[in-house]
Amino acid sequence: TFAVEYYDNKLKKFVPNPHGTQNAVLYIGTEMELVDEVEPIMLAYIADVPQDHIMDYDYAEGEYERVLYAIDILNRSQIYLEYVPDYDISTLEQTIEKYVLQKNVRHVYFDYIHITTDLIAEFQGEAKAKMQLREDQVLANVGTKLKELTRKYDISLDTWTQVSGDWKNENNRDQTIIRGAKALSDKVDCGSIMMRPTVAELRKIDPILKNRFGGQKPNLY
């Protein structure tokens, strides 16, 4: 976490977070509204209050006060948000460079890799010959460019992309279901496909749960 404090549910109080004072982070969003959608997620995490309580303005005892204090924490933290709906690589680089130079940002979260009209126009302008670019070519180029930005600015960069309709095939949940450009998987240092486990997958770990964890089920699916 990058917040300077967070609510510890065991201690029932806010506690300092040394990682929050030593690191600056930039979130670049392309779809979700920063104030209405992204900030409530952050406040829910910092205050340990269910997000729907914040969105519905329906608080249990003590939650409203915690959210108010979480707003103050967010303002004091080195957490920066930028909204870039129709992005291209040039815009991303300008945004990242600004925060690296002005705020000493070293961690960037980009939500998320997908096709935009500006992106297509940018790559077509850079192409040596006028040609119709395929979606997989554009997305693969985005992965290459983002990798170059991490080296150029010495930053870590986390991002996401979509999966294709093949995700429904329970026997084929690997890099081949990345939507548009399977080559994206070749550009990442660490990646994962986040999905709820199937019944068959849960059965496979039953022996481990029984022998190691007393049969306790995972608390996150």
Where are these regions (language model features)?
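Flexible loop/turn segments at secondary-structure boundaries
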Residues: 33-39, 88-89, 114-119, 165-169, ...
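Generic beta-strand/beta-sheet core signal
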Residues: 28-30, 82-84, 110-113, 160-161, ...
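Phosphate-binding/switch loop-helix module in NTP-utilizing enzymes
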Residues: 78-149
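Short secondary-structure boundary/capping segments
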Residues: 41-47, 123-126, 172-174, 209
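Helical mechanochemical/support elements of P-loop NTPase systems and associated helical scaffolds
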Residues: 34, 38, 63-66, 70, ...
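Cytosolic-facing regulatory segments adjacent to core modules
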Residues: 9-104
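Phosphate-binding/switch region of NTP-binding enzymes
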Residues: 14, 20, 137-221
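Glycine-rich phosphate-binding P-loop
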Residues: 1-3
